[in-house]
């Protein structure tokens, strides 16, 4: 019973967080030597750092054609937009769904659908609030193009935010990905944009809470109309 209760709160940690937690822990020990109340503040910050870099197991739906959320967070934008030029996907607008991640969300990023990475392009930029529309164009970003089995393409863009200063991408051109497979993360608050293939409607609405690798964002085979309005 106790083990089950602990497993509810204690999740695996992404390896990217190991050095940060170690630094926080060492600083905490020093703070205890200086003044005990400061040490307890350090304990709280160390626990928060561990929590930020958590990497929980996700149960990804297996039905063919489903596109899942690449990130935990809230849907902040749904609009037509041209995918990043550096991906070479052409000038035609695609439906863009943006998922904003706060500093309290899990920041491990997952592939929205299975396919082969055909392009990876990093572009330096500003660090505006990631919830702003212009963050897609102005902020530091890392863009991926994924070719699906039927030849269509989808784009996924990692966007740095107001606090984030480090985008981690663990795939390169030619890497095969499974739906829900981990491909990177962004530290300390950020955003993920997904560009859907032509004719594919998002099955989410503004303000909807998303779980990476689990929440269905769209369905390549569904005739269902696009949802309107916002989450209530």
UniProtKB/Swiss-Prot annotation:
Keywords: Cell membrane, Decarboxylase, Lipid biosynthesis, Lipid metabolism, Lyase, Membrane, Phospholipid biosynthesis, Phospholipid metabolism, Pyruvate, Zymogen
UniProt protein name: Phosphatidylserine decarboxylase proenzyme
Residues with site note (Cleavage (non-hydrolytic)): 189-190
GO molecular function terms attached to this record: phosphatidylserine decarboxylase activity
Cofactor: how bound: Binds 1 pyruvoyl group covalently per subunit.
Compartments, record wording: Cell membrane
High-level lineage: Bacteria, Pseudomonadati, Pseudomonadota, Alphaproteobacteria, Rhodobacterales
Keyword hit for Lipid metabolism: yes
Bilayer disposition of the protein: Peripheral membrane protein
Originating species: Cereibacter sphaeroides (strain KD131 / KCTC 12085) (Rhodobacter sphaeroides)
HAMAP family: PS_decarb_PSD_A
């Amino acid at each position: 019973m106790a083990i089950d209760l602990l497993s509810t709160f204690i999740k695996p940690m992404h390896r990217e967080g190991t050095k940060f937690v170690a630094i926080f822990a060492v600083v905490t020990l020093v703070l205890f030597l200086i003044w005990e109340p400061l040490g307890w503040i350090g304990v709280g910050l160390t626990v928060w750092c561990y929590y930020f870099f958590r990497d929980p197991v996700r149960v990804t739906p297996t039905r063919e054609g489903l596109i899942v959320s690449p990130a935990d967070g809230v849907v902040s934008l749904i609009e037509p937009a041209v995918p990043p030029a550096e991906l070479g996907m052409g000038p035609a607008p695609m439906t863009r769904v943006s998922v904003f991640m706060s500093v309290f969300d899990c920041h491990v990023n997952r592939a929205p659908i299975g396919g082969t990475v055909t392009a990876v392009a990093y572009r330096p930029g500003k660090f505006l609030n990631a919830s702003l529309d212009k963050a897609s164009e102005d902020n530091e970003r890392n863009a991926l193009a994924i070719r699906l089995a039927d030849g269509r393409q989808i784009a996924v863009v990692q966007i740095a935010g107001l606090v984030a200063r480090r985008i981690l991408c663990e795939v390169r051109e030619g890497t095969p990905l499974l739906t829900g497979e981990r491909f990177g993360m962004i530290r300390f608050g950020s955003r993920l944009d997904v560009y859907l293939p032509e004719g594919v409607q998002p099955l989410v609405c503004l303000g909807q809470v998303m779980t990476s690798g689990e929440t269905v964002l769209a369905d390549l085979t569904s005739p269902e109309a696009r949802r309107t309005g916002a989450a209530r």
